[in-house]
Curated annotation (Swiss-Prot):
Role noted for this protein: Dual specificity phosphatase able to dephosphorylate phosphotyrosine, phosphoserine and phosphothreonine residues within the same substrate, with a preference for phosphotyrosine as a substrate. Involved in the modulation of AMPK and MAPK1/2 signaling pathways.
Similarity remark: Belongs to the protein-tyrosine phosphatase family. Non-receptor class dual specificity subfamily.
EC number(s) per entry: 3.1.3.16, 3.1.3.48
PROSITE patterns per UniProt: TYR_PHOSPHATASE_1 (PS00383), TYR_PHOSPHATASE_2 (PS50056), TYR_PHOSPHATASE_DUAL (PS50054)
Protein name (database record): Dual specificity phosphatase 29
One GO cellular component term: cytoplasm
Stretches assigned to the Tyrosine-protein phosphatase domain: 47-194
Catalytic activity reported: O-phospho-L-tyrosyl-[protein] + H2O = L-tyrosyl-[protein] + phosphate; O-phospho-L-seryl-[protein] + H2O = L-seryl-[protein] + phosphate; O-phospho-L-threonyl-[protein] + H2O = L-threonyl-[protein] + phosphate
Localization: Cytoplasm; Nucleus
Source species: Gasterosteus aculeatus (Three-spined stickleback)
Biological processes per GO annotation: negative regulation of MAPK cascade; protein dephosphorylation
Keywords attached to this entry: Cytoplasm, Hydrolase, Nucleus, Protein phosphatase
Record's keyword annotation contains Cytoplasm: yes
Binding residues for substrate: 138-145
Length: 206
């Protein structure tokens, strides 16, 4: 990827950005991130897939099939499509007799929607859920909203770059966050790279 993009500090979402001049890593532009999903080596679509130890990404069917959740051993559900329109109507009450912890976010699968407002809370829920695994993160199709939140979790909690997170997840599930979500994940990647650079320079000054 880095050999095909131009190094830039521009805020242009279509430009690549190199945050750390001593690193070979470059945050790709949004269009380059989209291209990562269009190769033929990714996973085929399924209702639910394990994308990280004890972390599952699934669709509406998976979230609604209570017997299937028991078989999977799901203990926590993150509904990335809470609400009434083009969303999954479950809620905490749907799982009251299953000893499942529920967390819902009202996210629209639109490029203009600010899903980054849920990156921190979703990451915290997934992280805490893994002390009592397993967690299902879902939306309607399990491809855009839920995928964006899991990608953010891998970046924020496990230190993956946006490129590494995408490559990891797409090998295990057929996902495709919308263009706006990718733009926000790209911005998160730059922010995390800047944080790490500040930490590195701070340690060098000690």
């Amino acid at each position: 990827m880095s050999s095909r993009v131009v190094k830039s500090r521009s805020k242009n979402p279509y430009a690549a950005v190199q945050v750390d001049p001593d690193s070979d890593y470059i945050t790709p532009g949004t269009l380059d991130l989209e291209q990562l999903f269009w190769t033929s080596t990714g996973a085929q679509y399924a209702h639910v897939n394990q994308v990280w130890p004890s972390v599952y990404v699934g669709d509406e069917k998976t979230a609604l099939e209570r017997p299937g959740l028991r078989v999977l051993g799901i203990t926590h559900v993150l509904n990335a499509a809470e609400g009434k329109w083009n969303n999954v109507l479950t809620g905490a009450h749907y799982y009251t007799d299953m000893d499942i912890q529920y967390f819902g976010v009202e996210a629209d699968d639109k490029p203009t929607f600010n899903i980054s407002q849920f990156f921190c809370s979703a990451t915290q829920f997934i992280h805490e859920a893994l002390s009592h695994p397993k967690v299902l993160v879902h939306c309607v199709m399990g491809r855009s909203r839920s995928a964006a939140l899991v990608l953010a979790y891998l970046m924020m909690e496990h230190g993956l770059t946006v490129v590494d997170a995408i490559e990891h997840v797409r090998q295990r599930r057929c996902v495709l966050p919308n263009h706006g979500f990718l733009r926000q994940l790209r911005a998160l990647d730059i922010t995390l790279q800047e944080d790490r650079l500040r930490q590195k320079r701070g340690m060098q000054e000690q």
